[in-house]
Design a protein with these regions (language model features):
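Secondary-structure boundary motif
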Residues: 63, 67, 96-102, 125, ...
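Substrate-recognition/cap helix-loop segment adjacent to the acidic, metal-dependent catalytic center
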Residues: 26-29, 90-137
Length: 202
């Protein structure tokens, strides 16, 4: 029986997108996309999510791509401009789960420890969680099984009693290998349907 819900944050509850900031720098959309795909890549950003300092991450990239120094430094100096609004349809589902008083609800997020306080101050609903495990603080990230285990052990969660929600299939598969039932998030509407199918929501 499910008694614990574990949410991912980015792309599920919070809209974070580097395009929002870099569109103010690049006049050409394709040029911007090429920069994000080849310079400030997802793999590079995930190193900071896993605990590398923003300063070190920036310095490594500037050394590798000195011709892009200004635009690389903008990634974290203007990081807050990459934050969009909350995904309010999903927040409403979170609220409904919270108000049912049936579940402990946690967040398991790949997020830099240095930028996460900005999100905490901006999105009030983050205070609704019974606990948040941040990759940058723990120095490891999804899909490492040890990262999931931190949450399970810290909050005395049994895998078979938990439900995990994430937009990244890689992270879903890792959770399922640990025996955690999971929902691959694609939209708030489909999430609500699946939660009803599981009798998690009425």
């Amino acid at each position: 029986m499910i008694n614990t819900i574990i949410f991912d944050l980015g792309a599920v509850l919070i809209d974070w997108n580097p395009h929002y900031m870099y569109r103010t720098i690049f006049n050409d959309e394709e040029e911007m996309k090429n920069f994000l795909a080849s310079v400030t890549t997802s793999d590079w950003n995930e190193e900071q999510d896993a605990g590398r300092s923003l300063q070190e991450g920036t310095d490594v990239l500037v050394k590798q791509f000195p011709e892009h120094e200004a635009n690389i430094r903008a990634f974290y100096s203007r990081w807050e401009e990459m934050l969009g609004d909350a995904f309010w349809d999903t927040v409403e589902i979170f609220k409904e789960l919270k108000e049912s008083n049936k579940y402990k609800i946690y967040a398991l997020t790949n997020w830099s420890a240095e930028t996460f306080p900005v999100a905490l101050s901006r999105y009030e609903f983050l205070n609704w969680f019974d606990g948040i495990v941040v990759s940058g603080t723990e120095k490891m990230r999804k899909p490492a099984p040890e990262f999931y285990q931190i949450l399970l052990k810290r909050h005395n969660v049994k895998p078979e009693e938990a439900l995990f929600i994430d937009d990244n299939l890689r992270n879903i598969l890792a959770a399922e290998k640990l025996g955690i039932q999971s929902i691959h998030f694609t939209s708030a509407g489909l999430l609500k349907d699946k939660l009803k199918q599981l009798d998690v929501l009425q």
